[in-house]
Amino acid sequence: MLTLASKLKRDDGVKGSRTTSTTLDSMRRISVRDRLLVKEVAELEANLPCTCKVNFPDPNKLHYFHLTVSPDESYYQGGRFQFEIEVPDAYNMVPPKVKCLTRIWHPNITETGEICLSLLREHSIDGTGWAPTRTLKDVVWGLNSLFTDLLNFDDPLNIEAAEHHLRDKDEYRNKVEDYIKRYAR
C-alpha cells in the first residue's frame, strides 16, 4: 500500500549511482508533505481506533483518503460515517481539509459536511488548533471522538441540532436514528 515509501527507498538506494545534481533533483520532487505522510500513514494504521477504518482510493496518493467511523456507543452507535481527508501541499504547517460525506444530525457537523473540530482550525486563540506537531493520527482520533467525548452541544456549528437536543433529547435521539437508517448504513 505504501508505494510512495517504496519509491523513496528505491531513490535512496540508487543515490550512489547518480550525480549530485540528479540526486538533489530527485529529493526536490518528493515534497515534504509526502515524506511526512509515509511515516504518518504507517503510524496511523498501527494506532487506528477500533471504530475506524481508512481507505486510500489511490495508494500512490497518501494525501487523499477516506475515513469510516463506526461508533460503538452514544447516539451514533450503529452508524457508519464517511469522511474525506485531503492533506494540502503546505502540510504540516496547515491542517488537513476534512469533510463529512455522510448526512448526519450532529451539533458539530453540518448536514452539508462542514466540521467543527478545534484541531482542524488553522488559527485558534485557545491554543487547541492546528500545530505542526500534530499528525494524521490526531485528526483521526479527533474525528472519532466527535461521536463520544468531544460531542459538544455548548459550542455547535449546527445550531439547530444543538437546540433540538436542548429542547427534547428523546426526539433528538429519534432524529439521529432516522438519519442513521437513511444515510449511514
Curated annotation (Swiss-Prot):
InterPro entries: UBQ-conjugat_E2_core (IPR000608), UBQ-conjugating_AS (IPR023313), UBQ-conjugating_enzyme/RWD (IPR016135)
EC number assigned by the record: 2.3.2.34
A GO BP annotation: protein neddylation
Gene3D superfamilies: Ubiquitin Conjugating Enzyme (3.10.110.10)
Boundaries of every UBC core domain copy: 32-185
MF terms (GO), sorted A to Z: ATP binding; NEDD8 conjugating enzyme activity; NEDD8 ligase activity
Active site, UniProt feature: C116 (glycyl thioester intermediate)
Location of the region described as Disordered in the Swiss-Prot/TrEMBL record: 1-21
Main enzyme class: transferase
Functional pathway: Protein modification; protein neddylation
Family according to the record: Belongs to the ubiquitin-conjugating enzyme family. UBE2F subfamily.
Entry function: Accepts the ubiquitin-like protein NEDD8 from the UBA3-NAE1 E1 complex and catalyzes its covalent attachment to other proteins. Together with the E3 ubiquitin ligase rnf7/rbx2, specifically neddylates cullin-5 (cul5). Does not neddylate cul1, cul2, cul3, cul4a or cul4b.
The protein, known as: NEDD8-conjugating enzyme UBE2F
Organism per entry: Xenopus laevis (African clawed frog)
